Amino acid sequence: MEFIADPFADIPTRAPQQKVAAGEEPAVNILVLGTDSRTSASDPSQWKEGAQRTDAIMIVQVSGDRKTVSVMSIPRDSWVEIPGHGQGKINAAYSYGGPSLTIHTVENLTGIHIDHFAVANFESFVALTDEIGGVRVNLKTPQTLAGKELGAGAQVLNGQQALAYTRERSSLPNGDFDRVKRQQTWMRSIVSRVLTNGTLSSPTALYSFLKTASRTVAVDESFTLNQMQSLALETRHLHSNDIRFMTVPTAGTGTSADGQSIVTLDADADAPLFKAFAEDRVSAYLTEHPDAVELLPATVN
C-alpha cells in the first residue's frame, strides 16, 4: 500500500472535531479525490506543483452509528477561497499544494473535520470494478463504451467500459454536472456490488478487495489496511438505500474576472448541509429538508 506522509501536519488551522457523548462513536469523514492525471495516483511522490488537478472531489461520511454512508461531491470548478492563493477553482488546490492544501481548502469551505484522505485517478477504479466482476448501470440511450456497442437499459460494465462511461462529457446536456452524477453512479455501483455479492461476509473476499484497493489508491499514513477492514465490517449490514450520494447545491455557472469558466456555490443552501455533515446529522437534515438536496437515485442511470 502507498501511504502519504501525514498530510494534516502542515495545516495551520483545522476544522473542529465532532463532539460526541460518552460511549458514542464519531462519524468518519474521508476526503476522496480523483485526479485528472493518467499517471498512477497510487504513487504520491509523482505529485508536482502545477502538474495535477482533481477531477472529482468527494467527502465520504460513515455515520457514527454506522447505519448510513453519505457521499457529497463538490464540483471541480467551484469558485472558492484557497488558503494562501486567494479565490480559485477548488480543483486547483491539489495543483498548488497537494493533499495538505486540498484538505485545508475543503475544511475551510465546509467546516467539516477530515479524518482520512485518499487519492486515485479513475483508472484505479478499473481494477476494483474488474475485481468484483463488473458494475451494473442503466443506460438511457445506446452507447459505445471502450469499443463495445451497448444497448439502452441495464448493462454490466467492465472496468474499461465504466471508465469510458464516466469520462464522457461532450454529449451530456449538463456537462460536468452530469459527469459528477456518472462518477457517483460508478461509486454507488461498486458499493452495491460489494454489499450484495458476499464480499463483506467473506474474510477472504474482503481481504482480496481491499488488497486490490491498496495497490491502486494512496491514503494518509494513519489509514491502515486493518482500519479499512474494520470499517468495512462495521458497515457490512448496510443496504444500497443506506448510502446517499449528493452534490453540493450551486447557484449556477459563470466566468471569473480572469476568464475562467466557474461554478458558483449556493452559500445559503450549502451552510446548513455542511453543518449537518460536521455534526453527523445528515439523516435528520435530509428528513427535515427533503427538497434541499438532490440525491442520486438508488437505481442509477
Regions found by a protein language model. Name each.
Residues 23-26, 35-36, 49-53, 67, ...:
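Solvent-exposed, acidic/flexible segments
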Residues 28, 124, 128-204, 208-210, ...:
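Flexible, polar/acidic helix-loop-strand segments at domain edges
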Residues 54-56, 87, 91, 99-107, ...:
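Extracytoplasmic/secreted envelope proteins and their assembly/folding machinery
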Residues 61-64, 79, 95, 107-111, ...:
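Sec-exported extracytoplasmic/periplasmic mature domains
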Residues 91-151:
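Amphipathic, coiled-coil-like alpha-helical scaffolding segments used for oligomerization/assembly
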